[in-house]
Structures are given as structure tokens and as C-alpha cells.
UniProtKB/Swiss-Prot annotation:
It is an enzyme of class 2 (transferase). Keywords: Cytoplasm, Methyltransferase, rRNA processing, S-adenosyl-L-methionine, Transferase. It comes from Actinobacillus pleuropneumoniae serotype 5b (strain L20). S-adenosyl-L-methionine binds at residues 100-101, 116-117, 170. This is Ribosomal RNA small subunit methyltransferase J. Belongs to the methyltransferase superfamily. RsmJ family.
């Protein structure tokens, strides 16, 4: 993985801490750049500046609008994880990405442990979480309900200590559409991490960690994860949520 590391902020020490923590190495020939400004950490595709920058922002913009005016418990992901009545499952989001589905779940009351294996994406996610924790409106519930795990892969979680009611998986899958039709964020992400070609390997550790169910979000044209037929699926316009029920008893 190659990336340029650019500091446009006045805080050189913070920039170096980010690079050291995530073990990032500057490559001046890379077309992707991780940039620290005085406001945020962001990802840019230098050969396509019109795409704009990608950053994690839970405080305002699209995510704030979704929290205030979205479907809440009625959102497809909330239904898929089994939210019903007073039941708010604990969740491991094993492919956290930019944390958007996790934020929906946290906004309705679920506690979510976020796992992200790509260090650049994890750095962006952590930056967004830190800013959200400091926000007077959402900071308190964010600190309680959205936590970034210390490990980068769910296979490293302790089944005895860190199992959850639900393990949620949304692995990257190749798009059918031509790249020009794919939204800017996905185009940059595809260049950064590509498809999760080894995503079948998530299934066994996910089942081990899930007390109630494993939920896998897939494009409607994608095969079942690890060729495992789900107990049932919930479909939306372009996606489906494959649900695998667990027989583990709660401790």
C-alpha cells in the first residue's frame, strides 16, 4: 500500500503521531494522499482532484442529517441486526470502513465495537471519532457506543471476553458499474483497498464471536459469503442482508 503523507496543519507533532501509530510510510510517487489539516484528517486522490477529499464526519453534514431525519430503527441495517422493542444488541462491526452503518446503529442505542484492518481507513475513522467525542451534542453517546478496537482483524478478538450479540460484515465487493458511475468515495476506496477478496475468511471468526446472529451486507448480485446459505435474507433496492443465526447462549 503506497500513500503520500502530507501535513497542512500547524501541528507537526500530531501528524507524526498519526504516522507512527498506524505505521504509515510516505511514498512521494503515490496518487493517494493522507492529509492532516487544522480541521481534520482526509484522503485525497491527487490525480482526480475534482473528486474532493474523503473524511469521517459524524457531527454535521450527511451523517448528522441521517441521524436526525433518517429512518432510525426503520433503516434496513437496524432491522437486519434484529433491533426490536427494547432489544438493542451489542454489535461488532468487523469491516467498519468510515463507520456509517455503525453510526446508524449507535444513534438508535446500540453499542458498537469497530474493527478496521486497513490502517489508512482506521486512521480516518479514529480522527472522525475523536472529533465526535468532543462534540457537545453527540459526544456523550458516541464515547459510550462507538469504540474503535485495538486489533485490526476480528480473528484477534477474544471470544470469551469480546463476543457480541451480532457481528456485522460489509466487505468490499467489485462493482458491476463502470468506475465513472460509482460514487466518488467508492472510487477512492477501491483504489486504496480494492475488493476484500479474502472476505470468506471472515465467516468462521464472525460465527465464533456472535451470540445471536451474523449479518452480511452484500450487493444484490453477489454470492453468499463463503458459499454459506443464510437462515434468511432481507433485501433492499440494491443490496441484501444475509442473516446467519447463532446457537451460542448468552453468558
Amino acid at each position: 500500500m503506497t500513500i503520500q503523507l502530507i501535513n497542512e496543519s500547524s501541528n507537526t507533532e500530531k501528524f507524526q503521531q498519526i504516522c507512527d501509530k498506524w505505521r504509515l510510510v510516505h511514498d512521494r510517487s503515490a496518487i493517494l494522499a493522507l492529509v492532516l489539516t487544522d480541521e481534520r484528517l482526509e484522503l485525497r486522490k491527487l490525480d482526480e482532484p475534482k473528486l474532493g477529499a474523503i473524511a469521517v464526519n459524524f457531527v454535521d453534514g450527511t451523517m448528522a442529517h441521517r441521524r436526525k431525519f433518517g429512518g432510525g430503527r426503520g433503516e434496513a441495517v437496524a432491522k437486519a441486526v434484529g433491533i426490536k422493542g427494547d432489544y438493542l444488541p451489542t454489535i461488532i462491526d468487523a469491516t467498519a470502513g468510515l463507520g456509517r452503518d455503525a453510526f446508524v446503529l449507535a444513534s438508535v442505542g446500540c453499542k458498537v465495537l469497530l474493527v478496521e484492518r486497513n490502517p489508512i481507513v482506521a486512521a480516518l475513522l479514529e480522527d472522525g471519532l475523536v472529533r465526535a467525542y468532543a462534540d457537545p451534542e453527540i459526544g456523550a453517546f458516541m464515547q459510550e457506543r462507538m469504540i474503535l478496537a485495538d486489533v485490526r482483524n476480528i480473528s484477534l478478538l477474544d471470544v470469551a471476553q469480546q463476543a457480541a450479540d451480532v457481528v456485522y460484515l460489509d466487505p468490499m465487493y467489485p462493482h458491476k458499474q463502470k468506475s465513472a458511475l460509482v460514487k466518488k468515495e467508492m472510487r477512492v476506496f477501491q483504489h486504496l483497498v480494492g475488493a476484500d477478496l479474502d472476505s470468506d475468511n471472515f465467516f468462521v471468526p464472525a460465527k465464533a464471536l456472535a451470540r445471536k446472529r451474523v449479518v452480511v451486507k452484500r450487493p444484490d448480485y453477489a454470492p453468499f459469503l463463503a458459499e454459506q446459505k443464510p437462515d434468511f435474507s432481507q433485501t433492499t433496492k440494491n443490496h441484501r442482508f444475509d442473516v446467519y443465526l447463532s446457537h451460542l447462549k448468552s453468558a
